[in-house]
UniProtKB/Swiss-Prot annotation:
Belongs to the UPF0161 family. Its main location: membrane. GO terms for cellular component: plasma membrane. This is Putative membrane protein insertion efficiency factor. It comes from the Bacteria. It comes from Campylobacter concisus (strain 13826). Transmembrane segments: none annotated. Keywords: Cell inner membrane, Cell membrane, Membrane. It is found in: Cell inner membrane. It is a peripheral membrane protein. Pfam families: YidD (PF01809). The keyword Membrane applies. Could be involved in insertion of integral membrane proteins into the membrane. InterPro entries: Membr_insert_effic_factor_YidD.
Amino acid sequence: MKKFAIKFIAFYQKYISILLPKSCRYYPTCSQYAIWEFQTNSFFSAFFATFMRILRCNQLFKGGINYPIIRKKFNSCFIFQKSDTKNVNFWFIPCQNSKFYVVKVLDKLKEKN
């Protein structure tokens, strides 16, 4: 279901969103936020977070920078494992206890590696 949701949002971005004026009050845009949520969260958590984000995206709210926040537990041994940094897609920036901001790695930085 997550893959279907991501493909549906990608279809919206590619074919429908370009026909409409840019009106999202947040960075990342609501559709990009939804894709990040579905890539890093469970389906229902991502759906709820996306739904709440779309409800906040109007003239009654200030807008601004609003990265997805996920809950994640890392194993301590994970830190010491050798990993391939070329496959890093997201940075998890600590926010609160086991909650992290999700920040997408720029494609330009991926190409340099």
